[in-house]
Each structure stands twice: as structure tokens, then as C-alpha cells.
């Protein structure tokens, strides 16, 4: 009986083909992995986790995790869309040290082209700071992230988030309140995509 099950398993693997997964165009459309399936329909909606280093080749970006979801399969090629990003926990832990203050902000935004996102930002102050200073820094986060959402389309907002540009703007403004060790966009989740009118 066990031998029969083993044969059946081998037969199922023989039927499977490997599909090449590609990053979204605005991440360069590069190959980011392979996935097996016995039917192309089963590849649809699969989510792959890669790092920004895998996409760009930049070893300093290995702590940035990206999530791409397959939305189309043509032949052996599987094409993806961006579903989210987050920073590795180990990286976040390395930023938060004794006698520092971590300020978190969670913001639901809508980009210029109608994508609804949940954006989580964080800032690390060099020392313990007052509650009023925390509030002021969180307000700066909110103002910059909302302003960027109004100005940028989905693709540009995501790129400016993962490459650190938005975080750099937050750090620049927040240091007027108190010097920061670091500011980061630590997580993005796509909540809703705009409906395409046929």
C-alpha cells in the first residue's frame, strides 16, 4: 500500500511543470523564483516572498521583504503584482536599543490613482523622549505620508517607501523635534485596488 502511495506521489510530480515567477514591471520585471504546478490555474494567486536584495542585487537591502502575488500566467511565465512589504524582525530589533524611544504610526491612505494601503511607519529617537515629542513626531509621519499619497501614484509611492526616500523625509523633519537614530516605513499592505471599468 505504501509503495502504491509512493508511486502515485511520483506520478503527480511527473505531471508538474515549473513556472518562472517575475517581479512587477516597476521592480524591473526580473525573475524572482520558480514554482511547480500541474495546472497553470493553480499558479494564479500564489504569493511569493522575496527580499529587495533579490530584486536589485543590493546586499544592504536584504532586510526588506517584498510580497508579490501571481495574477497572470502565459506559457511557463507567471507575472505578479505587489501585495505588500515589511522589514525583517531581526532588523527592527537591531534598531531598538536601551534608552531609545520607538515611535510607531499606522496610517490608512489612498494613493493618487486610487489604491488603498495600510502604511506602518516607525522612528527611533536617540534617547528617551517626552510624550509630547512622540506625538509631534507621529504627526510629522502622518503629514508626510498623507502628502506623498496625494502626490504619487501607487507604483511611485511603493518605490519611494522601499528605497527609503519617504523615511528620509520623515527623519529630516522629525529631527527638528528630536534627533532620530532611524526612520523607516516598516510595513505596507495593499487593502484595495481601484476597480477597472471595462
Swiss-Prot record:
Annotated protein name in UniProt: Small ribosomal subunit protein eS1
Record keyword Disulfide bond present: no
GO biological process: one example: translation
Coiled coil start-end: none
Subunit field text: Part of the 30S ribosomal subunit.
Keywords from the UniProt entry: Ribonucleoprotein, Ribosomal protein
HAMAP family in UniProt: Ribosomal_eS1
Molecular function in Gene Ontology: structural constituent of ribosome
GO cellular component terms given for this protein: ribonucleoprotein complex; ribosome
Keyword presence, RNA-binding: no
Source organism superkingdom: Archaea
InterPro entries assigned to the protein according to its UniProt record, in alphabetical order: Ribosomal_eS1, Ribosomal_eS1_arc, Ribosomal_eS1_CS
Top-level taxonomy: Archaea, Methanobacteriati, Methanobacteriota, Thermococci, Thermococcales
Annotated family: Belongs to the eukaryotic ribosomal protein eS1 family.
